[in-house]
């Protein structure tokens, strides 16, 4: 079984209930699916009216060792008083197995959506990211990957070459735009940055607000530069992004040193995310959930827009990076 073709069709509600029951959890409510395409995630309430989330991992995306590293990082963060949703241990085990599925149970953490344009909230997030990275620097992931050009650009480019989803009449222009974007990223990429363990997918949708931030979903945790956990929080025009980044860095540096040279990686990382995300969609197209939720991927208009986006991002990479005020 490879994770590209896997569809979760055998993960029935009874299978989920049985898996939880074997861990001593009796579900007293329905299973409410949460928004996750990579894995299958459900919220529920047990007989004691405690609320939990159960995550069933997509087979073969991560190995058991890689998932356990994610769990270990989350538990270390909780121990260091960083607000993250960490897995619950059953008989000392956080990674569980049922009928060939790896799964984990988490406490359900409610909260409002993080307001990316709220400077007070941004400052608090920056402070906790500094603490998160303080923990992240204590050791590196051994089994989980490090952010790099091969995973984010080279492998997706090979996938695009053979893809049948790309309309034949638009494929040459799309591949040309992809190659130009890869060349632009490669020219501006650095590998002399300090590597640490990261959240990996730290955008506003993965932060809840309950009198402070709560970080969720460490599924994309990996090694990489600190800026990876900062840049996706920025929004608006360059002036707004500058103010937001300065707010984050000032709070961040209460706990961790930040290398401002990494700001030059923001646009390369943005380009890498654009390419990687598209490849992710295409790899999972055999899963019925993807054609259902992303039907536009088969339309010519989408590929025209995607080609234009790649061309524009290649141009952005030729511009000077975001500049902080002189005090930085």
From Swiss-Prot:
GO molecular function list: ATP binding; magnesium ion binding; protein serine kinase activity; protein serine/threonine kinase activity
Database matches in SUPFAM superfamilies:
Protein kinase-like (PK-like)
Q: What class of enzyme is it?
A: transferase
- Regulation: induction: Expression is regulated by the CpxRA two-component regulatory system.
The cofactor named in the record is:
Mg(2+)
Q: Which GO terms describe its cellular component?
A: cytoplasm
Tell me where it mainly resides: cytoplasm
The record's subcellular location field reads:
Cytoplasm
- Which parts of the sequence bind Mg(2+)? 206, 217
Keywords associated with the record: ATP-binding, Cytoplasm, Kinase, Magnesium, Metal-binding, Nucleotide-binding, Phosphoprotein, Serine/threonine-protein kinase, Stress response, Transferase
The answer to whether the entry has keyword Nucleotide-binding is yes
Q: Which Pfam families match?
A: APH
Q: What is this protein called?
A: Stress response kinase A
Say which species the protein is native to.
Shigella flexneri
């Amino acid at each position: 079984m490879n994770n590209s073709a896997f569809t979760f069709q055998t993960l029935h509600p009874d299978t989920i209930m049985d898996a939880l029951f074997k861990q001593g959890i009796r579900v007293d409510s329905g299973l409410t699916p949460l928004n996750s395409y990579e894995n299958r995630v459900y919220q529920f309430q047990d007989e004691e009216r405690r609320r939990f989330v159960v995550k069933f991992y997509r087979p073969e995306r991560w190995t058991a060792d890689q998932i356990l590293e994610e769990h270990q990082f989350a538990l270390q963060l909780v121990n260091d008083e960083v607000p993250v949703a960490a897995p619950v241990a059953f008989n000392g085990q956080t990674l569980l197995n049922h009928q060939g599925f790896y799964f984990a149970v988490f406490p359900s953490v409610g909260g409002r959506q993080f307001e990316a344009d709220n400077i007070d909230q941004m400052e608090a997030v920056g402070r906790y990211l500094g603490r998160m990275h303080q923990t992240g620097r204590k050791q590196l992931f051994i089994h989980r990957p490090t952010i790099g050009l091969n995973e984010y650009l080279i492998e997706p480019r090979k996938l695009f070459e053979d893809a049948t989803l790309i309309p034949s009449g638009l494929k040459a222009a799309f591949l040309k735009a992809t190659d130009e974007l890869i060349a632009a990223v490669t020219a501006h990429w650095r590998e002399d940055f300090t590597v640490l363990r990261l959240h990996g997918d730290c955008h506003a949708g993965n932060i809840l607000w309950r009198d402070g931030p709560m970080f969720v979903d460490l599924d994309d945790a990996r090694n990489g530069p600190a800026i990876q956990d900062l840049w996706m929080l920025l929004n608006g025009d360059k002036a707004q992004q500058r103010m937001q980044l300065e707010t984050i860095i000032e709070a961040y540096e209460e706990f961790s040193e930040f290398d401002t040279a990494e700001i030059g990686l923001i646009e390369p990382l943005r380009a890498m995310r654009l390419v990687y995300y598209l490849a992710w969609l295409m790899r999972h197209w055999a899963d019925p959930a993807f054609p259902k939720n992303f039907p536009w991927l088969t339309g010519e208009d989408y590929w025209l827009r995607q080609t234009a986006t790649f061309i524009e991002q290649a141009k952005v990479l030729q511009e000077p990076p975001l500049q902080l005020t002189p005090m930085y």
